[in-house]
C-alpha cells in the first residue's frame, strides 16, 4: 500500500501557510506498508525521512498493539471467556467496551499536565510500558495459579481495565504527539494502516486461538493467549521507541490557576463547541456494533452448537473485514474526510443487525463477523479523523480528553443497556433491533455536522 506523499506545513500568526504541501495519490494494494514517496525539495525543520520514519513507526506501533489485543479479541474471545468462567450477563455485556472506557477515564484529569509539556515522548513511553505489564502478570497468574478458580474471573476482567486506566494517563499526550507528527490529510491513511497491520496479525490470531483452545482448553489456554498478547504489545512499545518527536509550530501554555478552576472551566469550554456536543451524541448512538457483539459469539455458538475453539474462525474473518474496511476508509477518508465514513459505517450496522437476526448457519455467522470487522473499522477511522479535525489546535489536548471522558459513559451506558435488555428478556433479537435504531438516529445527528475539510476549502 502506497500512502499519500506529504510535506510539512508551517503556521505563522494563526494562519496556515502551505510550504509546498503536496499529496500524492492514495493507492491501495494488498501489502500493508510500502515506502512513502518523497518529492520534497525545500529545506524543512525536520528532514522528510524523519517524518516518513515516524509515520511508519506510528503504523507499526498501533498494528502490533491492536494485533496483540486480537488474541484476546474484546468483541469475540472475551465474552465467551467470561461466560465460561461464570460471569453474569452484565459483565459479558461490557467486555467489548471495558478497555476503551478505561482508556478514556484518566485523560481528562491529566490533560492540564499534558498541555504544559514541551516533549511528549518520555511521558508516552513511560506509561506505555506500564500499561502493557498487566497482560504479562495475568498470563503468569493464570499459568501458575491452577488451584485458584475464585481468582480467574477477576483476573480476566480486571486485566484490560487496569491496562486501560494506566494507558489513559498517557493517551492524551500520545494523541497530541501523533496529531503533530501526521499531517491532516493523511491521518485517515495512518489510522487505516494501523488497523490493516492489526488485521493481518489478527487473521493469524484466529488460527492460533483455535489451536490453543483445542489443545489447552480453559485456564492454561487463557494463560497462553495473555502471554502471546503481551509479546506483541512489547513489540508495539519497541516500535514507538524509534520515533523522533517533532516540535510544534505553536505551543499553548494554559494560564496558571488552581486545578479546581481548571475543572470548573471544562463545561463552558465544551459548551462553546456545539459540533463537539453533536459528536458526543453521534458516538453514543453509534454504539450499535458493541451492543450486538457482546452477545453475538454466545448466540452464534449456541445456535450452531459449535465448540468454543471455533470462535477462532470468527476472529479470522472479522480481521479480513477489518483489512478491506480499513483500505476503503484510507481511500475515502483521504478524499472526503471522516464524516462520510461514520455515515457509511452506520448504514452497514443496520444491515449487520438484520443479518444476525435471520441467519442460523455457521457460515452465515462467519459472514456476519466479516461485516462486523468491515463496518466497525470504518467507524473507528472515521471517528479518529473527524475528531482530530473538529478540535481547535490550541485546546486540542483538553477537548479530546473531554470527548474521551464523555465516551466512557457512552460506552458503558450503551453496552449496559444492551446487557439489561438481554438479561431481562433473554432475547438477542431485541438487542439487535435496538442497535439498528441507534444507528439510524446517529445518521440523523451526523447530518447536522459539517465536514471540516469542506469548510476549510471554502474559507
Annotate each predicted stretch with a short phrase.
Residues 140-158, 357-368:
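Helix-loop junctions at membrane interfaces in 12-TM secondary transporters
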Residues 122-138, 340-355:
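Structural signature of the two symmetry-related core transmembrane helices
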Residues 340-380:
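C-terminal transmembrane helical hairpin of 12-TM major facilitator-type secondary transporters
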Residues 32, 141-143, 232-244, 433-459:
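Multi-pass alpha-helical transporter architecture, strongest
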Residues 137-138, 163, 240, 355-356, ...:
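MFS-fold secondary transporters
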Residues 244-264, 455-459:
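Flexible cytoplasmic inter-helical loops of multi-pass small-molecule transporters
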Residues 57-75, 95-111, 127-131, 159-243, ...:
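Substrate-agnostic recognition of the 12-TM MFS/MFS-like secondary transporter fold
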Residues 25-105, 131, 275-315:
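Helix-loop boundary and gating motifs at the non-cytosolic
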Amino acid at each position: 500500500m502506497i500512502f499519500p506523499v506529504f510535506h510539512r506545513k508551517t503556521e505563522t500568526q494563526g494562519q496556515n501557510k502551505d510550504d509546498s504541501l503536496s499529496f500524492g495519490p492514495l493507492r491501495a494494494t494488498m501489502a500493508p506498508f510500502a515506502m512513502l514517496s518523497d518529492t520534497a525539495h525545500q529545506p524543512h525543520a525536520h528532514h522528510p525521512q524523519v517524518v516518513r520514519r515516524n509515520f511508519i513507526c506510528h503504523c507499526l506501533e498501533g498494528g502490533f498493539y491492536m494485533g496483540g489485543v486480537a488474541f484476546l479479541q474484546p468483541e469475540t474471545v472475551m465474552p465467551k471467556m467470561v461466560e465460561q468462567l461464570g460471569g453474569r450477563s452484565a459483565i459479558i455485556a461490557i467486555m467489548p467496551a471495558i478497555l476503551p472506557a478505561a482508556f478514556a477515564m484518566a485523560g481528562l484529569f491529566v490533560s492540564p499536565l499534558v498541555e504544559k509539556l514541551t516533549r511528549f515522548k518520555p511521558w508516552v513511553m513511560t506509561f506505555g510500558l506500564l500499561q502493557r505489564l498487566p497482560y504479562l502478570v495475568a498470563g503468569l497468574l493464570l499459568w501458575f495459579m491452577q488451584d485458584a478458580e475464585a481468582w480467574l474471573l477477576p483476573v480476566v476482567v480486571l486485566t484490560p481495565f487496569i491496562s486501560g486506566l494506566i494507558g489513559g494517563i498517557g493517551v492524551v499526550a500520545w494523541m497530541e504527539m501523533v496529531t503533530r507528527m501526521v499531517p491532516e490529510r493523511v491521518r485517515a491513511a495512518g489510522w487505516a494502516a494501523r488497523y490493516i497491520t492489526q488485521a493481518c496479525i489478527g487473521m493469524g490470531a484466529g488460527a492460533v486461538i483455535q489451536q490453543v483452545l483445542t489443545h489447552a482448553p480453559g485456564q492454561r489456554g487463557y494463560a497462553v493467549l495473555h502471554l502471546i498478547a503481551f509479546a506483541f504489545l512489547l513489540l508495539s512499545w519497541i516500535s514507538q521507541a524509534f520515533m523522533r518527536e517533532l516540535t510544534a509550530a505553536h505551543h499553548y501554555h494554559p494560564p496558571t490557576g488552581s486545578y479546581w478552576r481548571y475543572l470548573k472551566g471544562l463545561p463552558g469550554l465544551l459548551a462553546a463547541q456545539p459540533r463537539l456536543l453533536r459528536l458526543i451524541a453521534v458516538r453514543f448512538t453509534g454504539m450499535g456494533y458493541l451492543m450486538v457483539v457482546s452477545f453475538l459469539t454466545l448466540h452464534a455458538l449456541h445456535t450452531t452448537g459449535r465448540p468454543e475453539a471455533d470462535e477462532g474462525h470468527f476472529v479470522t474473518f472479522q480481521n479480513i473485514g477489518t483489512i478491506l474496511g480499513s483500505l476503503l476508509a484510507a481511500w475515502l477518508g483521504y478524499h472526503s474526510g471522516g464524516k462520510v465514513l461514520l455515515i457509511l459505517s452506520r448504514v452497514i450496522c443496520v444491515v449487520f443487525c438484520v443479518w444476525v437476526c435471520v441467519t442460523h448457519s455457521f457460515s452465515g455467522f462467519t459472514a456476519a463477523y466479516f461485516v462486523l470487522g468491515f463496518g466497525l473499522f470504518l467507524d473507528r477511522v472515521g471517528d479518529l479523523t473527524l475528531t482530530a479535525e473538529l478540535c481547535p489546535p490550541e485546546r486540542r489536548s483538553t477537548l479530546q480528553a473531554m470527548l474521551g471522558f464523555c465516551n466512557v459513559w457512552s460506552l458503558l451506558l450503551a453496552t449496559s443497556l444492551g446487557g439489561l435488555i438481554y438479561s431481562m428478556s433473554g432475547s438477542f433479537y431485541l438487542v439487535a433491533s435496538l442497535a439498528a435504531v441507534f444507528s439510524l438516529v446517529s445518521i440523523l445527528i451526523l447530518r447536522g455536522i459539517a465536514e471540516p475539510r469542506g469548510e476549510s476549502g471554502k474559507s
